[in-house]
Amino acid sequence: VEGEKAGPAPGTLYGVGLGPGDPELMTLKAARVIARVPVLAVPVKSPGAESFARGIARDHIRADHTLLELVFPMRSDPEVLRPHWERAAGALAAHLLAGRDAAFLCEGDPFTYGTFVHVFTQITRDHPHVPVRVVPGVSAYHAAAAATLTPLADTDDRVAVLPATYGVEVVEQVLERFDTVVLLKVKPVMDALLDLLERKGLTPHAVFVNR
């Protein structure tokens, strides 16, 4: 309508990877984005619970930051998690549509098996005019390879990365096709994985790293 005042330009949503846990593995860009934005969002597994992402970035969080604790229960069922993704996206969108930049802090890398992927999908679908930027982070398996001096790939090696919770049958198929297999979320199927590795004679070549 002519003469009607336009609303503020939307803020930018940043997905900020913080790395695997060591604050010294945060990138300079991650630190700069955190310093620049007024709103920070951190994932928690329940209201008031400790946030691992917040702990990594604690030295960069200021008293004047608006801090959003977004609840994502430790569940795997998408139907259970979807309302939490929607609420998180809505809480962020309220700030973004008011013109405030916001950073979603993620352990590891934002686009590698992270909660940010779901929030990103929701916001870009519902608010396609909101700018989004992603700051990559060091993934846990890269840090694990470095800590154990285990090269992941060389020359023509084939590498697969997948959650072990896909099932031992899937893992066995992947082991047949790839030179290096990185398994995430192994604890729920640890016994079955150990049996598989023993059966295939791969136990001497396996490395387990825990946080």
Residue ranges and their predicted role:
Residues 3, 107-177:
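Class I SAM-dependent methyltransferase SAM-binding "motif I" and its flanking Rossmann-like core
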Residues 17-18, 104, 136, 162-163, ...:
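Small/polar loops that bind or transfer phosphate-bearing groups
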Residues 43-45, 165, 184-188:
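Structural motif
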Residues 20-21, 45-48, 72-73, 138, ...:
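Short, acidic/turn-prone active-site loops that include or flank metal/cofactor-
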Residues 1-23, 28-131:
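Class I S-adenosyl-L-methionine
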Residues 47-50, 75, 139-142, 190-191:
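Short gly/pro/ser/thr-enriched loop/turn and capping motifs at secondary-structure boundaries
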Residues 10-13, 97, 174-211:
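A contiguous loop/helix-start segment that scaffolds small-molecule binding in enzyme catalytic cores
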